[in-house]
Regions:
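Bacterial Sec-dependent N-terminal signal peptides
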Residues: 1-17, 240-244
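Short loop/turn motifs that connect adjacent beta-strands in outer-membrane beta-barrel proteins
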Residues: 15-24, 51-56, 100-110, 161-167
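Transmembrane beta-strand segments that form the barrel wall of outer-membrane beta-barrel proteins
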Residues: 21-42, 56-64
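Transmembrane beta-barrel domains of bacterial outer-membrane proteins
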Residues: 22-25, 30-34, 45-48, 146-147, ...
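Transmembrane beta-strands of outer-membrane beta-barrel proteins
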Residues: 25-29, 55-61, 91, 109-117, ...
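Extracellular/periplasm-exposed beta-strand and loop segments of Gram-negative cell-envelope proteins
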Residues: 30-34, 66-90, 120-148, 176-231, ...
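Residue-level signature of outer-membrane beta-barrel architecture
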Residues: 48-50, 63, 97-99, 157-159, ...
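Outer-membrane beta-barrel "beta-signal"
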Residues: 92, 96, 230-244
C-alpha cells in the first residue's frame, strides 16, 4: 500500500508539473499587412488561453499606412512627394472557440471560430504641382483620411511547431464594415483643380488599395471629396507566433 501511495503521489506531482508548464500565452507578428500595405505596416498580437483551455482571446495593435501611390503625372497634374507625416494604426480583438471535437491537439492548436472587431485608421499627406488654365502652376498639399470599423465572425486554424512556434491563419472572416473617407486641401482651389486631384487620388487608391471599389463610392468621392459607406467587411490574416 505504501508503494502504491508513493506512485500515486508521484503521478499527481507530475501532472501538476505538466499543468504548470502549459503554455497559455502567444505573441504574434502579422506578416500579411506588410505584403499588402508595405514595410511600414507592423502589427503585433497577443493571445491568451483561458482556464477552460478551449477558449482564448487575442488583441492586435500596430502601425499601418496607405500603400505608396507611385508616379502620378499628366498634362495638368504632377505628384511631387509623399510627405513625411504618414499616419495609420490598427487595433483589433477576437474571442476564439477551439473546436475540440475537430482537433487532435489541445488549444491553441487547430480549428477555431469566433467573433472579432477591428478598427483601422489611414492618413496620407501628399504634395502636388497643378497647372492652371492660364499656364501658371501652384503647389498644393492634400490630406486623405480613412476610418474603418469592422465587426464579424471568423474561421481559422493555428499550427504549432516544436511546442514554441505557431503559425496562425484567419482563413475566413466575413463581417460588416463602416468606411468614412475624406480628402482635404491646404489651398483654396477651384472646383476644376479639386476635381483633378480627387480623380488622381481615386485612380491611385483603386489600383493600390485592396477592395477600394467595394468600400468607397468612387463617384461620390470624386464629386465631393468625401464618402461614408456601410457595406461588407472582411478579415484575413497570417501571423507568426512564439508561445510561452
Amino acid at each position: 500500500m505504501m508503494i502504491l501511495s508513493g506512485l500515486l503521489q508521484t503521478a499527481s506531482a507530475q501532472e501538476t508539473k505538466k499543468e504548470e508548464k502549459f503554455r497559455k500565452n502567444t505573441v504574434h507578428i502579422n506578416i500579411t499587412n506588410p505584403l499588402i500595405f508595405g514595410s511600414g505596416s507592423i502589427v503585433l498580437g497577443y493571445e491568451r488561453l483561458l482556464k477552460s483551455k478551449k477558449h482564448s482571446f487575442s488583441i492586435n495593435i500596430g502601425l499601418t499606412s496607405f500603400p505608396d501611390f507611385g508616379l502620378i503625372e499628366n498634362d495638368s497634374l504632377k505628384h511631387l512627394a509623399k510627405l513625411k507625416d504618414q499616419k495609420g494604426f490598427n487595433v483589433s480583438a477576437d474571442y476564439r472557440f477551439y473546436l475540440l471535437k475537430e482537433n487532435k491537439h489541445p488549444a491553441p492548436r487547430g480549428v477555431y471560430i469566433g467573433p472579432y472587431y477591428s478598427y483601422n485608421y489611414f492618413g496620407n499627406h501628399n504634395s502636388w504641382e497643378i497647372k492652371n488654365s492660364n499656364g501658371s502652376t501652384a503647389i498644393v498639399e492634400s490630406e486623405v483620411k480613412l476610418n474603418v470599423h469592422t465587426i464579424g465572425f471568423e474561421f481559422g486554424y493555428q499550427f504549432v511547431f516544436r511546442d514554441r512556434i505557431s503559425l496562425d491563419m484567419v482563413l475566413l472572416g466575413p463581417g460588416v464594415g463602416t468606411y468614412d473617407f475624406k480628402a482635404g486641401f491646404s489651398n483654396n482651389l477651384s472646383d476644376a483643380a479639386k476635381q483633378k486631384i480627387l480623380e488622381a487620388l481615386d485612380g491611385a487608391l483603386a489600383e493600390k488599395f485592396p477592395g477600394y471599389g467595394i468600400i468607397v463610392n468612387e463617384e461620390e468621392f470624386k464629386r465631393k471629396g468625401s464618402t461614408d459607406r456601410t457595406t461588407i467587411g472582411y478579415r484575413y490574416m497570417v501571423q507568426l507566433g512564439f508561445r510561452f
